[in-house]
Amino acid sequence: MGQKVHPNGIRLGIVKPWNSTWYANTKEFADNLDSDFKVRQFLIKELAKASVSRIVIERPAKSIRVTIHTARPGIVIGKKGEDVEKLRKVVANIAGVPAQINIAEVRKPELDAKLVADSITSQLERRVMFRRAMKRAVQNAMRLGAKGIKVEVSGRLGGAEIARTEWYREGRVPLHTLRADIDYNTSEAHTTYGVIGVKVWIFKGEILGGMAAVEQPEPAAQPKKQQRKGRK
């Protein structure tokens, strides 16, 4: 059987950035990695209802900077920033260095693979029919400008005795094209019949220029200069 490489892993450094960006010597590397894992575990558990897409960790000069990408920044920040301050203290305690937490808003959650997968799992846990949940996610993504989307669910679908896999695709999802901006993520729905796995691939277009094009902000549109016609 043909196996697929992880769509995010194969594109790291080409069109996808890392979720942890720091350098460490051999002695500190394992501790930093363990600290990153614990910080992510804590934040994902604490912000389960805040629609968190991804958590980026940086370590500038004996400190830790955590950027939380979320579709609901108000829930993360809390009243007058109280909730985010509590998170900052716990993260600093886990990492053992001063912590800073930044919040980045996800403008279009329908085009974020993690948020789409979480949305489908929450619907499956509320006993919504899996085909309806899949179709709704695909339609919303295509309506908001996705070039292609594929959704796959696996498990005891509809309470069936034998587990199976079903998928639904619309548009293009070119997994072999390295410059293709493909957002991939997974989630799990814990139902009364067992666990149902959800996978989502979203193709947003091709990125020309590699990581340099990803990291550079889009230039602001400049007004066109009107040319004066001279007399002949």
From Swiss-Prot:
GO terms for biological process: translation. Keywords: Ribonucleoprotein, Ribosomal protein, RNA-binding, rRNA-binding. One of its GO terms (cellular component) is cytosolic small ribosomal subunit. CDD domains: KH-II_30S_S3. GO terms for molecular function: mRNA binding; rRNA binding; structural constituent of ribosome. PANTHER family: 30S/40S RIBOSOMAL PROTEIN S3, SMALL RIBOSOMAL SUBUNIT PROTEIN US3C. Binds the lower part of the 30S subunit head. Binds mRNA in the 70S ribosome, positioning it for translation. NCBIfam families: rpsC_bact. Part of the 30S ribosomal subunit. Forms a tight complex with proteins S10 and S14. Belongs to the universal ribosomal protein uS3 family. This is Small ribosomal subunit protein uS3. The lineage of its organism: Bacteria, Pseudomonadati, Pseudomonadota, Gammaproteobacteria, Enterobacterales. The gene is rpsC.
